[in-house]
Design a protein with these regions (language model features):
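An amphipathic, basic-hydrophobic helix/alpha-beta surface used to engage anionic
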Residues: 14
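Outer-membrane beta-barrel proteins
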Residues: 18-24, 306, 412-418
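Short, glycine/alanine-rich hydrophobic alpha-helices that insert into or span membranes
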Residues: 555-564
Length: 597
């Protein structure tokens, strides 16, 4: 490959004016330099050696020269720059040509930037084009710049305009650079778009999540010489991510030891499906669109796409996000969303992640430690006050119900994907539902084929009132085991017993009905649910079962789980909640049958 450039730089002609008076105080002041057909060939090797580094001869004196060089403005005509940076895997060719006629700055900048300090910006005099690769990604672009570069005079902003594509990312900027000799400040209108925000990482080093296709339009201000590190502020931007709108302001500080991104974002109307890529829960077609190489196996439900934890230690973050209105189907009655995301040295915290659901709240604290391999996860969730009539708005029998769903869940696990985390997790799940109803029609609304089969076998075509449904599951190494799972209906007490295996996504559940009172319950044989999450299968057991674990619900041996579930009954509603009576009965010790004492 290329190891050195034949010439570092060349000029056809150079013209300059020298101010004679400052020579009296040992200052070489050049008010203006004009360069004719400048060309630079820049080369940096993989070992860091660069042809723009010069070994100057050692001075006989350690004292600095008393003379000072003061260049005020520099102008140029048609020129070119080539860059071959083997360390950054970047090869670029830049061509600069004079425009036929200067273009006024305000004509391209618009009203927002053509006011204030930027109003003094020069006209655009040159057009430029760039082509090549940047950090291994194809890059192409074009734009316009001014003719006289005001090197020191901040009152003469230098105009910039560019449209650049790099990989799947597109950027358009128009604005000014001030005090360029000291890389002083940028004032730009910036439009960004691409197939996923995560694709900005190799270009900018900013760690952003996987998203659907996005576009933003906002005001970028940069102060490049801040003491704490260069500061970039993308303020009052508006955009779209998938079918959701996005607004806000973000600040990025290139501080040490890690840069930090902070800000507040809002979405007036958030499509819930647009959150799918955050955990790899979008379709394979959508993964391909955003440039993700992993694919979800057809026989797996839990997302296998891995979090990019190797990026999490490259940047810190403190960002608040509010989704004011959630767009979803009737099966997902989520109304709003709020989260406070903090990323610090690879530890990602969502504290809280809060959803409004069916008139209640789903609140969770999530800690994902990406600084460890595999990633260590801890999740705590609580569901409070989910109104059943809002959970199932299309199910008429539930519309007169005052019932609620309440629950708690916690888990800890390790792994770099949702599937890996759940496949080896420890934790528990507790849930109570009171004053509900169920029928074949409800399972059809929810799209549950297996549920449809079970309800039909248990209750026929009738709508059945559920006094209480109570569930307590333990989770150990990815295997969730029923400690208590019971439906108390007007006709029967239905016990569900068995396991759900998150490691292999297999179901092994038995459903056993017990008739109540003098009513004769028609089903004699228990049911089963087998198969996988993707293809569950239900059927009727050939004969009676030997009770396992919590299978002795009807005999009242679930003292511990019943007592812990009582905590989910709201104190103000305990008298009306039919779960209270059921769980109180289950707390009593089992009675030993007569004759077996």
């Amino acid at each position: 490959g290329k190891t050195k450039a034949s010439e570092f730089a060349s000029l056809e002609r150079i013209e300059f004016r020298l101010a004679p008076l400052p020579l009296l105080w040992q200052t070489i002041r050049i008010p203006q330099i004009k360069l004719t057909q400048p060309r630079a060939d820049l080369l940096r090797l993989a070992d860091g050696r660069a042809n723009w580094d010069f070994d100057l001869p050692a001075s006989d004196s350690d004292e600095p020269s008393a003379w000072q060089l003061d260049i005020r403005e520099i102008g140029f005509d048609k020129g070119s720059v080539s860059l071959d940076d083997q360390r950054l895997k970047t090869r670029l060719e830049v061509l600069v040509d004079p425009l036929g006629k200067p273009v006024p700055f305000g004509q391209l900048a618009g009203k927002a930037l053509a006011t204030g300090d930027a109003a003094d910006a020069q006209d655009y005099v040159f057009g430029w084009k760039v082509k090549g690769t940047y950090k291994g990604q194809a890059l192409a672009g074009s734009g316009k710049v001014g003719g006289m570069l005001a090197l020191q005079d901040a009152s003469k902003p230098f105009p910039l305009q560019a449209e650049v594509s790099a990989g799947s990312t597109r950027a358009a900027v128009v604005g000014t650079l001030t005090d360029p000799l000291n890389l002083g400040a940028l004032d730009l209108r910036l439009k960004l778009s691409g197939t996923s925000m995560a694709n900005l990482y190799p270009l900018t080093g900013i760690t952003l999540p996987d998203t659907p296709a996005y576009s933003t339009d906002g005001h970028l201000l940069a102060r490049l010489k801040e003491e704490g590190g260069a500061l970039f502020r993308y303020e009052n931007f508006n955009g779209k991510v998938g079918a959701s709108d996005l607004h806000g302001s973000l600040t990025f500080v290139a501080r040490q030891p890690r840069p930090k991104l902070s800000g507040k974002l809002t979405s007036e109307q958030l499509r819930f499906a647009d959150l799918g890529p955050l955990i790899g829960a979008d379709s394979n077609a959508e993964k391909q669109k955003r440039g993700q190489t992993s694919r979800q196996p057809g026989d797996k439900v839990l997302p296998v796409e891995e979090f990019r934890t190797e990026r999490w230690r490259d940047m810190d973050a403190d960002v608040e996000f509010t989704g004011k209105r959630i767009v979803h189907s009737d099966q997902l009655p989520i109304s709003d969303l709020y989260t406070h995301l903090v990323l610090n040295d690879g530890l990602l915290r969502l504290e809280p992640l809060r959803f409004g659901v069916a008139g209640g709240k789903l609140e969770s604290d999530i800690r994902l430690d990406g600084g460890k391999q595999p990633m260590q996860s801890r999740v705590k969730m609580s569901a409070r006050g989910f109104k059943l009539k809002q959970l199932f708005p299309g199910f008429a029998p539930m519309q007169t119900s005052f019932g609620e769903l309440n629950g708690d869940a916690s888990l800890s696990g390790s792994g770099n994907s949702v599937a890996k985390i759940l496949g080896g997790a420890d934790g528990e799940l507790k849930m109570l539902i009171n004053d509900g109803a169920i029928s074949k029609g409800l399972t059809e609304i929810a799209g549950l084929n297996v549920g449809n089969y079970l309800v039909t076998k248990l209750f026929g075509d009738d709508e059945v009132k559920i006094n209480c449904a109570a569930a307590d599951f333990g989770l150990q190494k990815g295997l969730m085991t029923s400690r208590l799972f019971v439906f108390d209906t007007e006709n029967a007490l239905v016990n569900v017993d068995g396991t759900v295996n998150f490691a292999n996504e297999k179901l092994d559940l038995d459903v056993t009905p017990h008739s109540k009172g003098l009513r004769i319950f028609s089903l004699r044989s228990p049911l089963y649910v087998r198969g996988t999450f993707a293809k569950p299968d239900a059927g009727v057991h050939a004969g009676p079962l030997v009770a396992r674990g919590a299978g002795m619900i009807a005999l009242g041996v679930t003292v511990g789980p019943a007592a812990s579930l009582l905590a989910l009954v709201a104190p103000s509603k305990s008298d009306d909640n039919q779960c209270t009576a059921l769980l109180q009965r289950m707390r009593l010790p089992a009675k030993v049958p007569a004759g077996k004492r």
